[in-house]
Amino acid sequence: MHNLEVPEKAASLFGAAHYDGNLLILSCLHGVMGKVYADTVCSPQTAAAVIGDFTFFAGRVSHKAVAFRPKESKNDYRILIPQNRAWEEAIEAVYRGKYRKIERFATKKNPRAFDKDKLERIFSDFSRLSQRFEIVEITSQLYGQCLEMPWSRDLVSNYGSFAEFKKQGLGFVILDKGKIVSGASSYAACGDCI
C-alpha cells in the first residue's frame, strides 16, 4: 500500500453513499489529519483512510490492504471499518480468530440537534456536586499530561502538537486536585468541523 501524496485521488472510492460525510474520512481525504493509503498512486482502485485507531476501507476489496499496518499505528489494536459486506468478509478472513466484531453508533451530525440547555443543566449540577472538581480547557501543560497517561492519550494524540490541537481541535478535562480524571475532546478536525 502506498501513502497518497494527493489523498483526493481516492475520494471517489469512498463515495458519500457509504460514509455519509464522515469527518474522519474527510479529514484524511482533505489532507488535514490522518493518511490515505492505496494500491497504486496513479489510479487507485483500493484505499484505506487511516486516522488514529480507525481504518476505513474503500473500493476494490483487497486482503493485502486489510493486512497492511501503517507504521504510525500506535496501538496493538485497530478499529477496521468495512465499506460493505465484501470488505467485512475480507477482514474476517485475514484476522480469523484474532478480531472482535462490535457495532458502533454514529453521533448526530446535525448542529441543531445539540441541546445547549441540557449541557448547561448538567454543568450546573456538576458545579453543585463538588468544589473538588474543576472543568478546564486543555492547555499546553494539560496536553502534555494527556499524552503521559494511556487512558487520556486519545484526547489529544491525533494532533501533532499543542499548537495544532489549539488551532484545529477543542477539548476539556476534569481535574481533581490538579490531576486529570476525565476529559472530552475532538478526535479529528476538517475545515470548520470537529
Task: Spell out what each predicted region is.
Residues P7, V50-F54, A188-A189:
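A short, sequence-level motif marking secondary-structure junctions
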Residues S157-C193:
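A conserved beta-strand-loop-helix scaffold within acyl/acetyltransferase catalytic domains
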Residues H30-V50, G169-A184:
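Conserved beta-hairpin
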Residues M1-G21, N110-S161:
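Short amphipathic alpha-helix that is part of the acyltransferase structural core
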